[in-house]
Amino acid sequence: MDLYSLGLLDTLRAYREGRATVQDYVASCSQRISALEPRIQAWEWFDPSRAMAEAEERAGGILGDLPLFGIPVGVKDIIATRGIPTRYGSRIFATNVPVTSAWIVRRLEALGGLVMGKTVTTEFAYRQPGKTRNPWNTAFSPGGSSSGSAAAVAAGFVPIAIGTQTLGSVIRPAAFCGVVGYKPSVGAISRTGIHPISTTLDTVGVFARSVADAAWFGACLMGPDPRDDATLVKGPEKILRVPLEPLRAPPRLAVIRTSKWNLAAEPQRANFEASVIRLREAGAQVRDVNLPRLFDDAWENVMTIMSREAVRSFLSIESRHRIRLSPHLIELLDRGHRVTPELYGRARARRDEYRRWLDNLFERNDAIVTIPAVGEAPEGLASTGDASFAQLWTQAGMPAIAIPSGFGPRGLPLGIQIVGRYREDQAALEAAAWTEATLGFKPGLAGG
């Protein structure tokens, strides 16, 4: 077996059992990158000699009992890394090299992990695509904004990668690239040292090859950070504990198609309905839930919040470099400038209404099941896809997990999405692990 094909937990097990060393594993991943990166272009920055030096440093230390010992991680290039270029997907920061790492980077390194490299992001994690291609077919998009992170895990470059989501930037690329994407509850993981778009919506997420791997890594990254007030709301030990426990009984699942269902392509709808039948036959209590008219303006509402907060986040950059921003980002900022304080306040209040209504749904259900994207990845690199089936859960701050569920007619991955109650990631991930095992679909690694 090629070592690069091992997931996070399998790699830790191989280290413990003496079947692999950190140097062996990182070398295998580096060779995989050397072979496929020219076609996929998942990396904004990757230095194989530095990666091997990091591996040798880990192997020579006494970190073997740490939960991320020797695990190479892809870090989205919206996240500050000390001594490593951090460009935010923008030519404005082409020469930027931070002197301090983001909280989550310091965290993963303290737990024994190593930064394998910086993965491609869209411009400032918004809509302007980067250079990354879908590893299943390079004529198609990998999704975004966490394009490189999803592609790197799918191609076997790293077992795990970090992304961020403001609308659908973890869930959608995970679905397009055929990997597991876990977007935790907002505030579960610190955002200090990550370039913001929206303080209300921005969430750190994880790409992995299994739900168990995603949960393990996500739990490692959680912890209170005084510089990010959202992390202080509820202790991480109350959000997620690992390893995940198997469910004692099949979950109660609320099927929500949303008013955007007509946007979904027929192969995605058919795959979803077949998946729901499989879950029901396996014992899940499945019931359809229709969202009330309250949610009809959810897209307009999230854009009001996002655009207004983006104006604050980009105040300095816009004042000095507006001409160097993409039309997509300028459009967002122009929209934000038109949002009055009163309109912004109403949008925040409406967001709270969404969360309360959805929270009540979990009195009778363990998780929501829906689709993660409209279908297979779009052709070309002009668009990273539609976030319609991810934005509502992001807006409400709820945990969401994308799971591969099949291939579409173009040979590209399709997925299913499990959504949990706000700040109850444990139950969401346990339902997702059950769903993953029940569907039994393993896409394998992309890229040959």
Predicted regions and their residues:
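Serine-dependent amide/ester hydrolase catalytic core
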Residues: L9-R16, Q31, L247-R248, V311-Q395, ...
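An N-terminal boundary/leader segment
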Residues: M1-R50, E281-G283, L343, G444-G448
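Short, well-ordered beta-strand elements
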Residues: V206, L412-E424, A428-A432, E436
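Short helix-loop capping/hinge segments that flank enzyme active sites or metal/cofactor-binding pockets
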Residues: G64, L68-Y88, L247-I256, T304-D359, ...
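A short helix-breaking turn/cap at a secondary-structure junction
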Residues: K183-A270, T438-G448
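Acidic/His- and Gly-rich active-site-bordering loop/insert found
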Residues: A51-A53, G61-K131
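Short glycine/serine-rich loop segments
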Residues: T100-D225, Q395-G415
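Glycine/threonine-rich flexible loop motifs
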Residues: T86-T95, A265-E266, A377-T384
